[in-house]
Amino acid sequence: MKNKKGYLLLETVISSFIVITISISLYTLLLHSSKYKTSVEDRVELYEQGEEMCFQINKTIENSDGIISIRDLNGNTISGDTPSYVNVNSIKCKYKNSYRDVKDKEISYKRNHKLFINTLNSRGNSESGGYEIGDYVDFISVMIQGNKVAVKLSLSKNNEKYETYFKSYIKEF
């Protein structure tokens, strides 16, 4: 029998070191790719939610006969032009007139980070029900400039953030 003089132990240590290094590298690569995939999915979802909310809000405001009222987070009614964006809870739009018997609508922000479109009863209060148009909403802000309402939506999911801006034209305010 040959005497290898410790080479077997050295070969085992080197082989183990190489296997452990490759394993750690692959694990790190897998972990980072998983985080990146989640981040991209969150960004895409926020973008899609933002686009859908913009479409629904714009359609609701522009198809109305005007804005009834806009309320900020403190419950104060906003009237006239605003110099900057103001965070709001609700935007009430007038739909009912002498030619059509349709209920007025409200775009409302809920504290659970959701945005809803509700119908209003004859006293101007939200009826139960309504439908959710978006999720992950941090806040909705408006800036009124004449017959235009500039809307800013701020969304977030996990560590991803997304903001979108658009303008809606109103008939009367």
Can you name each region flagged by the protein language model?
Residues M1-K2, M143:
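Residue-level marker of regulatory loop/turn positions in helix-turn-helix DNA-binding domains and
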Residues K2-E62:
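Aliphatic-rich helix starts adjacent to a transmembrane/signal segment
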Residues S34, G130-E132, T164-K167:
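Surface-exposed beta-strand edges and their flanking turn/coil or helix-capping segments
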Residues F55-R71, I78-T82:
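Extracytoplasmic beta-rich ectodomain segments of secreted or membrane-anchored proteins
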Residues R71-G146:
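Type IV pilin-like appendage domain
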Residues I140-F173:
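Short linear sequence signals and composition-biased patches located at protein termini or domain-edge surfaces
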